[in-house]
Amino acid sequence: FKIPGLRAKLLFPLAMLVVFRFVAHVPVPGIDRDALDAVFSGGQFGELLGFLDLFSGGALRNLSVAALGVYPYITSSIIMQLLVPVIPQLKALSKEGDYGRQKINQLTHYITVPIALAQGYGQILLLQRAGIFNTVDLTGGAFPAIIPMIISMAAGTVFLVWLGEQITERGIGNGISIIIFAGIVAGLPQIVQQGFISRVDPTGLITLVVISLTIVSL
């Protein structure tokens, strides 16, 4: 901490993670919090959602604007990695040095938006099946009512990706990986308290360890 440059590189990611945790508690509009809590409090569906919530750092339980995390961006990155070798234009672009990498990164960001919108809609449908939106036909005439929810969740993903890139540029390490890991760490106390990891079936613990080690190795 005596070196100003190093101190800034360490403190900046911490500040951005504080912002991330704040955003994770900002709910999307139009949510019945009592119904959401009831679904998470019990039943097999609640356990499934609780496991998914582990990787969002509590954002799914709050159905916050950060409920999707940065996973749409991860999906977009994987898609681009698969497309570059098979599309001649992208393959040529990848060989143009920094300019090509910037263009591919830009395309990755563009693809992230529709993926986030689709995943946001899918997540809301999943919660409807769990009983949170029983009074609303999300596929019928009431569909416009959930448009603000979907847009806010997609916007949350875009914001988190931006935070991750700021951490990468101005901090230490890969910002996207740090945000994912921070989300997992933030969800651990609640998962342990609920006894998820302490169950006789060790599948949950093994899965958690494997995913955590994968993220750290990125």
PLM regions and their residue ranges:
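N-terminal cationic and glycine-rich segments that engage phosphates or anionic surfaces
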Residues: F1-S94, D98-L218
